[in-house]
Amino acid sequence: MTEKTIKDWEALAEKELRVSPEGLVWHTPEGIDVKPLYTSDDMSGIGHLNSLPGFEPFVRGPRATMYAGRPWTVRQYAGFSTAEASNAFYRRNLAAGQQGVSVAFDLATHRGYDSDHPRVQGDVGKAGVAIDSVEDMKILFDGIPLDRISVSMTMNGAVIPILASFIVAGEEQGVSRDKLSGTIQNDILKEFMVRNTYIYPPEPSMRIVADIIEYTAKEMPKFNSISISGYHMQEAGATLVQELAFTLADGREYVRAALAKGLNVDDFAGRLSFFFAIGMNFFMEAAKLRAARLLWTRIMQEFKPEKASSLMLRTHCQTSGVSLQEQDPYNNIVRTAFEAMSAVLGGTQSLHTNSFDEAMALPTDFSARIARNTQLILQHETGVTKVVDPLAGSYYVESLTNELAEKAWGLIEEVEALGGMTKAVNAGLPKRLIEEAATRRQAAVDRAEEVIVGVNKYRLENEQPIDILQIDNAAVRTAQVKRIEETRRRRDSQKMKQALDALADVARSGKGNLLAAAVEAARARATVGEITDAMREAFGDYTAIPEVVTDIYGKAYEGDPELGVLAGRLGEATKRLGHKPKIMVAKLGQDGHDRGAKVIASAFGDIGFDVVAGPLFQTPEEAADLALAEEVTVIGVSSLAAGHRTLMPQLAEALKKRGGEDIIVVCGGVIPRQDYDYLMENGVAAVFGPGTQVLDAARAVLDLIEGKRRNV
């Protein structure tokens, strides 16, 4: 048989297609041109091909036997309502096969507010569990043996009081801190880029990171001091190259901060962990994890560690939240299963699989069971655990691994040229690039250039709402306030004040360890809010200035008659109003997830609206004041954290009290269909759920403006 060449294949492909196979090249958002065929020629120059699992550069995995020796940890992220409700949920799941606990805190806790603070009325218990003191933490882990069950906590802004409360809760359960195992996220740099649950400015925030690394290295040898997260970057719109590069650049910055504390790299590097998102780009996501291990080894070699474990990247993964769709939601089960398989083939150490209903609300017991069992089926029924790194040697996957690594390294070097990640964050580079990528993707989805089944193709004509978990925010807040009052009544106030004063002195002086001081304050029953405020006196608050990218969404629609018709209507409305229709895009409460708000502000601006980008964390009253001062026609509220039932009626009432009834109020985001009527009855003119195309939303807003003008 005559050996065939790539030229032979090209000729045959062209005969089948009747055009050149070059038209099959997939131009990805990462700037990688994926070919329809890969061969041994694509392996040339790839340096890691002969590496083995358990040995540097760890492309094939950090452990020699990987899942053949022990499967990945099933670690489902959850938390809602009260500590009692979340504890019951954790215990049910542990009994059903879950192998670790991963805690989701509510936004009030993330931002360092106690549940009785007036700014968090709509946030308590809604998107996670409310924790105000050690008393809540003890209830959260009641009956869960902390010396045997590892605990992961997603916490960044209020990381000091939360970790301190966890340490004390463990002590009072009879588990000393050196026996506690798990992970604290403690990744503040990405908060300034995408998630926004920061409290203090970047510099003191980096001190907090370093103090936690120092404390855990000395006192908590089984505990991971940081989980460096790319997950939230991808959720905010980052490409896989951006997620990879910015996450590893964050990691490099944290290592430098720990070294500046006088630590030896081998004292802490083995306890650094990572956290990546896994989306629907199946092979590229698996290759991303392989590239991450390769690049992290390269970065850590700069610091000349003696232990091989200091060079290893160990990661947790979570299936994509962005890929979850409200429309035809049972499709999400399939999406999550594919993403889980991709994470496993990429070599994750632990995994969370999202529940199919999380595009609308917190998961129910039913949806959480399906999500958990997705992993158990992978572990026990597919045979995927039997072979270490089964994708190794694949022409396609090895080429992708190499190209992702090269492109990510180029972006890492760009960050270095700015002086490292803290300076890059201050310069706004990562945030701008991620927001541009998010806006481009929204345009691609709206134009059906990127197909999402059930959303922009193969849509159901009639969809039935599914059962969702509803949280009674008012009841949760009442219960939390009662417990706070009881805690304050029973504690030794003088001892508590002395502990807070000592913490404030450590913060002001720069001497001592913040976490060590906070542990004493938590033991004296200082609350999360009180510990946060003690440090706030020294560090101050951080306030981001809203900025919006331009000419991204509009460019995607250049020459499109659909946009031309809308622009014509906007021109007519401008003549009638005497100015461009003006919309304020607002975020209420402690919901810092601003991807949707930024995309809407950017796209509406490109379409021709006059856009006011409101600041994060506004109260309804503050939003009403700003809307009146800016003389806006419309307020568009983006809600992604379930606070809409409380905050939207409060906004309508605030506008009414100020004589702003004529301002049209609309909202969009993660809002269950079951809530639409309630919102419409409480001052909301239109609701735009997940999957709404931007041009459809713009047309609907313009319809409301025209109708309002005609009624005047």
UniProtKB/Swiss-Prot annotation:
GO terms for molecular function: cobalamin binding; metal ion binding; methylmalonyl-CoA mutase activity. Pathway: Metabolic intermediate metabolism; propanoyl-CoA degradation; succinyl-CoA from propanoyl-CoA: step 3/3. Pfam families: B12-binding, MM_CoA_mutase. The keyword Cytoplasm does not apply. Disruption phenotype: Cells lacking this gene show no methylmalonyl-CoA mutase activity, in contrast to wild-type. Substrate binds at residues 73-77, 183-185, 195, 222, 232, 271-273. Keywords: Cobalamin, Cobalt, Isomerase, Metal-binding, Plasmid. The keyword Metal-binding applies. PROSITE patterns: B12_BINDING, METMALONYL_COA_MUTASE. Adenosylcob(III)alamin binds at residue 593. Residues 580-712 form the B12-binding domain. Its EC number is 5.4.99.2. GO terms for cellular component: cytoplasm. Belongs to the methylmalonyl-CoA mutase family. This is Methylmalonyl-CoA mutase. It comes from Rhizobium meliloti (strain 1021).
